[in-house]
Each structure stands twice: as structure tokens, then as C-alpha cells.
Amino acid sequence: MSQEKYIMAIDQGTTSSRAIIFNQKGEKVSSSQKEFPQIFPHAGWVEHNANQIWNSVQSVIAGAFIESSIKPSQIEAIGITNQRETTVVWDKKTGVPIYNAIVWQSRQTAPIAEQLKQDGHTKMIHEKTGLVIDAYFSATKIRWILDHVPGAQERAEKGELLFGTIDTWLVWKLTDGAVHVTDYSNAARTMLYNIKDLTWDDEILELLNIPKDMLPEVKSNSEIYGKTAAFHFYGGEVPISGMAGDQQAALFGQLAFEPGMVKNTYGTGSFIIMNTGDEMQLSSNNLLTTIGYGIGGKVHYALEGSIFIAGSAIQWLRDGLKMIETSPESEQFALASTSDDEVYVVPAFTGLGAPYWDSNARGSVFGLTRGTSKEDFVKATLQSIAYQVRDVIDTMQVDSGIDIQQLRVDGGAAMNNMLMQFQADILGIDIARAKNLETTALGAAFLAGLAVGYWEDMDALKELNATGQLFKASMNESRKEKLYKGWKRAVKATQVFTQEEDADDDAK
């Protein structure tokens, strides 16, 4: 009797690495997680030790096997999903990184991004990459490493150094240096990849003086890239056959295969991605254009809006204000509120994300009265998450010309029923919460499994991640629009407040 076969997903995140084993029904049968240290050399800088990331991945692979008694020989394929944009540069011969990995959040390369803007490259880079010029993306991080590590530029020009985002680094390590590849979704976040022509862009590479030889080969999101070296996978030589950046993996895990389908992951922040089909659509309203996924020679583009503060607003209520003891408690407090929703919290603690991109804005509260209670404040904070999502969804509809009918949701805060119902009400559309909230890892597993025939085709996947719960809009139109207009006024007032503060400083 043959042994049952499984797919392993490696989910390499910003603070921890996970390995999850799925069966053919898309069910999680085993998982292991390990955190690794964050490095903060200066204010605003965030780095990781790339070898500590690799060690954490080896540890969780072993942990997933131990927990389940599944053997490496039972793994049909491996899928990888990862924190996007984070940049590693390493020695091609020794495999040793020449500097720490510079993390997506890090602002140490902001002066390079600012110089590119001042030199007038914004339009060219946006049209080619779909991105805004920002330190967020990999391009400025590579330039910074080549500038700050002695001899790095010369070594890169000699072909002695390799660059990769975390997906590339992990495949290179798992295959013992045999394979240097990335996928469409990760390449699209480097600010070096022409997402229309599907090539590394020579003009941008020349502008930043980044040697092309450093860059990995770009592959589709679902194909066999190589096999694990046996001594790096506990004796197993297993195909690595699926890769996608974390948010694109979640889009795929949510089965958002058709144009107009949208997913939102309610994590620390909120990441909303819309499948726009095979036509690249540049945003006129500060959304990012990116690649959702590419399979079998066909690329699906996407629009993305990032909200900085979502679940972390609930953490603020718990840890900062001590209004609640646990995050789930926020739902009970909000349901106990008897207010007419006249209180607005604008959680711009680190500025406002899409579609405003106002880094100077700071948090504010409007509409307080003597009768405002703790319950009202908690409810207003939860509602702020839903209002921000509407800001992005409305913008997506304008940019794409597509009428969005449903929002597919996952992530920790998606478990809050009150928030999900209010989200449905304020958008006026259905909210479909996934039955399996492991959508990021599941997306990577689906991509890997398709490449090796573990699942026959994308239609076969549609049975595997059914809707867990559907929230239908029940608020009348006039009330919905009145509440949302109040939110827009609150955001405008928040922005004006910081603008006037800046003007006062300039006048001194």
C-alpha cells in the first residue's frame, strides 16, 4: 500500500517562519513556527540575519515532520511564500551574505528614493514597474548595500555576488546553490522589473548601476524550479514547484482567479488586492499595480492598496490604552455600544496608507461628547478599519472600471463578526470569510501542487477553500453614506491639522 502524499508550504514572514503540511483536501495536518531576531541598527532601520532566517526554516521543516510523523518521502512538492521586498545580497561561491537582509519596512534607503524622485524618474518607473518610488521596494536596498559594503560594487560587476528576495534565498539554500530564481510576484516588487514586458528593465538597472548578472531568473508562480538537496531536506529530494509573495499567495489561496475578485487580509495592517486580469492597469489614485500570479504562460495583473493600521489598532486598545484585556474582547465591547456611530477614530499612527499616502498624518479622534463611553471608543476603532478598506475598494473601482460584488477576507481581525458585518454594511457588498484562514500558506501549496499534478487544475481547487461565513449588507443607503461622509471629513481634518503644524514649523 502506497503512503499518502502531502504538500508542504514554507511561509517565511517578517517575524517568524512557518512550515505547514496540507493534504489533498487542502486541510492542514501539521505545522511548526519559529520566531527569529529583529535587528534595529538605527531609528527607522530594520534588518534580519539571512542565515538566521534559513536556520528558522530548517527548524520548522523538522518541526512539521516531527509533529505529524510524516516523512520527507511523503512530500510531493514544496511551495514557498514570503515577506516581500526584503533584500539579500550574498557571495556566489561561499553563500555568505555580505550584509544583513534589509527588511521591507526599513527606511534606511529613503534618501536614494528621494533622489530618484528629485531627478524626475517617477513617471518612468511607475509606467514600467507599476510602483511608486519608495524605500519599501528592493531596488534602493540593493543600491544601499553596494554603496555601503566595501568592494561590493566591484565584486557585483565581476559576477561574484547574487541578489534575491527571501523566496530566492530559500530556494538557493534548499537546492544547495544549484538554483537562482524568483517568481513574477516577487520580481514585481523589486522596482527593477518591467511588468509589461516581463523582463528586468535595463534602463532602471543602468540608472541605479545594478549589474544584471546579480539578478535571479524570473519564472512563473507554478512550475518545478529545482529539487531540494537531500541533506537540506532530511534525506528527501523534493520538487520546489510553487512560489509567490505573501499577499499574492493569499489572493491565490482565496481562489480569486477572475478579474474583479478581491481579497483583503486583516493583519497588523490590511492588504487589499484585486485581480484585474491580463491587462496591466496603472492606477491614477495611488494604488500599486503589480502581478497577481502567472501560470502556464498567462499573467494576471492586480491592483494593491496597503493600509498601515488594522489589527494593530486593536492591539493599541489592549496594550496602549488598556481598554480591553484581549483582542477578541473588542467585539463584545463594540456590540455593547449604544452610540449612533458619531465618534470617529483615524488611526494614522504611522501616517495614512492607500489611497492617501500621507506619511505626515497622525492619529486623531472626532465626535467625543460627555456621554461617550469606552464601548463607543472601541467600536469607533473597529469601524476605522472598515472605513479604510472602503477608501481602497472605492478607489479600485474607479481605477479598474470593475464593479466589485464581493470581498474575500482572511487574517486575524477577520474573525471579529461585528467588524465583518460593519464592513459589509459600509461597502454595501457581501463579505466572504474563508473557511480555512491559512490562505497565504494554502496559496503557496496550491501553486506547488498544480505544478506536479497533485491537483489536476484550478477548477479542482475551487472545492477546497469554501466560504466559511457570508456577511450580507443590511444598512440602508442613506445611513451608510452619512457615516462614510463623516469618516471622510475626519480624515480631511486629520490631514489639515498636520499640514498646519508643518506650516507653523516653517514659519519659525
From Swiss-Prot:
Key enzyme in the regulation of glycerol uptake and metabolism. Catalyzes the phosphorylation of glycerol to yield sn-glycerol 3-phosphate. CDD domains: FGGY_EcGK_like. GO terms for cellular component: cytosol. The phosphoenolpyruvate-dependent sugar phosphotransferase system (PTS), including enzyme I, and histidine-containing protein (HPr) are required for the phosphorylation, which leads to the activation of the enzyme. The gene is glpK. One of its GO terms (biological process) is glycerol-3-phosphate metabolic process. It holds the Pfam family FGGY_N. The lineage of its organism: Bacteria, Bacillati, Bacillota, Bacilli, Lactobacillales. HAMAP family: Glycerol_kin. NCBIfam families: glycerol_kin, PRK00047.1. Coiled coil: none annotated. Its EC number is 2.7.1.30. Keywords: ATP-binding, Glycerol metabolism, Kinase, Nucleotide-binding, Phosphoprotein, Transferase. SUPFAM superfamilies: Actin-like ATPase domain (SSF53067). ATP binds at residues 14-16, 268, 311, 315, 412. The modification Phosphohistidine is found at residue 232. InterPro entries: ATPase_NBD (IPR043129), Carb_kinase_FGGY (IPR000577), Carb_kinase_FGGY_CS (IPR018483), FGGY_C (IPR018485), FGGY_N (IPR018484), Glycerol_kin (IPR005999). The keyword Secreted does not apply. It comes from the Bacteria. It catalyses: glycerol + ATP = sn-glycerol 3-phosphate + ADP + H(+). It is an enzyme of class 2 (transferase). This is Glycerol kinase. Transmembrane segments: none annotated. Belongs to the FGGY kinase family. ADP binds at residues 14, 18, 268, 311, 412, 416. Pathway: Polyol metabolism; glycerol degradation via glycerol kinase pathway; sn-glycerol 3-phosphate from glycerol: step 1/1.
